[in-house]
Amino acid sequence: MSRRKVRDTKEETVTLGPAVSDGEHVFGVARIFASFNDTFIHVTDLSGRETLVRITGGMKVKADRDESSPYAAMLAAQDVATRCKELGITALHIKLRATGGNKTKTPGRGAQSALRALARSGMKIGRIEDVTPIPSDSTRRKSGRRGRRL
């Protein structure tokens, strides 16, 4: 009878993030959508095709009225930063967005605190860009002929 060939099992180390040298940053894109009702922080790769992590302010607090608060946005941003570090992302380009269209062009309360929390948690910030959709000419805005009277 012939002998069986015994294969040595080799253990390979698998990392989640890309292989980079020390001191080199791996960039992702953080898309922060801050409306008056909630704050979304959505991190993708540079092409925007693959979602790495997506957390909202509503996932962090229980009360509905607190979803858009700066505190909820800060908690969401801290979670995003820890998850990005696990995946090997060390730096982020920021795309900040308000509701836009024929609604408000001003970002909500959570935008600034989310950005600050990302920076304080050790993520390097690349470019900050405002991507709020602004219409060249749009449909009629909500409210009557004379506007909203207070």
From Swiss-Prot:
InterPro entries reported for this sequence: Ribosomal_uS11, Ribosomal_uS11_CS, Ribosomal_uS11_sf
Protein name: Small ribosomal subunit protein uS11
Cystines in this chain: none
UniProt-listed HAMAP family: Ribosomal_uS11
Compositionally skewed regions (Basic residues) per UniProt: 141-150
Keyword Ribosomal protein annotated: yes
One cellular component (GO) term of this entry: ribonucleoprotein complex
Any one GO BP annotation for this protein: translation
Keyword NADP: no
